[in-house]
Design a protein with these regions (language model features):
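Repetitive helical segments and hydrophobic/amphipathic motifs
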Residues: 12-15
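Outer-membrane beta-barrel proteins
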Residues: 2-8, 18-236
Length: 236
């Protein structure tokens, strides 16, 4: 699950890093972009059709604040807005993400945080990139989490192992993801379940001598739900 107006970006930067005059301009890193995807697949789940997914990130000395969104061409697709505060050093990374996904015709209010009414989901992540392999663990710790077999908060979790490689002139990434215990948050997770097995290929397409367009294609399979997805995307 998983970009802001110029004014919002400025407020985010100021809140995180303090006065701009106190920080040298070349020490702050910022990026903005968007993906156009033929379908919205996330951790082995179908979350929508053709979507525009903008993002913006501001970082300083390993600390970062990012916003990400998704709006589907189909009006019945959820509208999503996520905020992530993270820190990384070397191969280590940790973050907290606030997911906010508004279902079609729902009246969910963004600043509604009351228990049993909010649609926010708060997730903690910790991981390490060893180079050949990256391992990440994610756990929902608050908000609209799923439930376990007893009807209690599941603290829904997900572990992902990914390995990048090159083949045939393309950049590839193979990954496998699983849920360690039962939760209604992930499709058909009745216990430990491998819910995402996928491979992504990406390449920069040359448009002109000075402009390239990153493109990617992802094939994924969810053994738990016996679902498969094939997504194509362009990054700007």
């Amino acid at each position: 699950m998983r970009r802001l107006t110029k004014a919002s970006a400025m407020l985010m930067s100021a809140a995180l890093f303090g006065s701009a005059s106190a920080i040298a301009q070349d020490e702050v890193e910022a990026s903005v972009g968007a993906d156009l995807v033929s379908g919205y697949e996330w951790r082995g789940q179908d979350l929508g059709g053709f979507s525009v997914q903008p993002s913006i990130t501001v970082g300083y000395k390993g600390l970062s604040l990012g916003a990400w969104g998704s709006v589907g061409l189909d009006k019945e697709d959820n509208k999503e807005f996520d905020l992530t505060l993270g820190y990384s050093t070397g191969g280590f990374s940790a973050s907290v993400t606030d997911y906010w996904s508004l279902p079609y015709q729902a009246e969910g209010k963004y600043f509604q945080y009351e228990a049993h009414k909010t649609i926010h989901v708060f997730e903690a992540q910790v991981g390490y990139d060893f180079g050949p392999v990256a391992v990440n663990w994610y756990t929902n710790f608050a908000g609209a989490d799923g439930s376990n077999d007893d009807g209690d908060r599941a603290y829904s979790s997900y572990i992902n192992i990914a390995a990048p490689f090159k083949l045939g002139g393309l950049d590839w990434k193979a990954e496998i993801g699983a849920t360690p215990w039962a939760t209604t948050f992930y499709t058909d997770a009745n216990g430990f379940a491998v819910c995402n097995f996928g491979v992504t290929a990406s390449k920069d397409i040359k448009v002109t001598d000075s402009f390239t367009l990153p493109a990617f294609a992802k094939l994924s399979f969810n053994p738990a739900s016996e679902s498969t997805y094939f997504v194509f995307g362009l990054s700007f």
